Amino acid sequence: GCCSDPRCRYRC
């Protein structure tokens, strides 16, 4: 998921 990706984590 997004929350595990450092590039996308900010969206969580």
UniProtKB/Swiss-Prot annotation:
Cysteines joined through disulfide linkages: 2-8, 3-12
Highest rank taxon of the organism: Eukaryota
Modified residues (4-hydroxyproline): 6
Keywords noted in UniProt: Acetylcholine receptor inhibiting toxin, Amidation, Disulfide bond, Hydroxylation, Ion channel impairing toxin, Neurotoxin, Postsynaptic neurotoxin, Secreted, Toxin
Chief localisation class: secreted
InterPro entries per the UniProt record, alphabetical: Conotoxin_a-typ_CS
Segments crossing the lipid bilayer: none
Cysteine amide: residues carrying this PTM: 12
Subcellular location: Secreted
One GO CC term on file: extracellular region
Tissue expression as described in the entry: Expressed by the venom duct.
Entry keyword Disulfide bond: yes
A molecular-function term among this protein's GO annotations: acetylcholine receptor inhibitor activity
Domain remark from Swiss-Prot or TrEMBL: The cysteine framework is I (CC-C-C). Alpha4/3 pattern.
Annotated family: Belongs to the conotoxin A superfamily.
Protein's job: Alpha-conotoxins act on postsynaptic membranes, they bind to the nicotinic acetylcholine receptors (nAChR) and thus inhibit them.
Protein name as catalogued: Alpha-conotoxin-like Reg1e
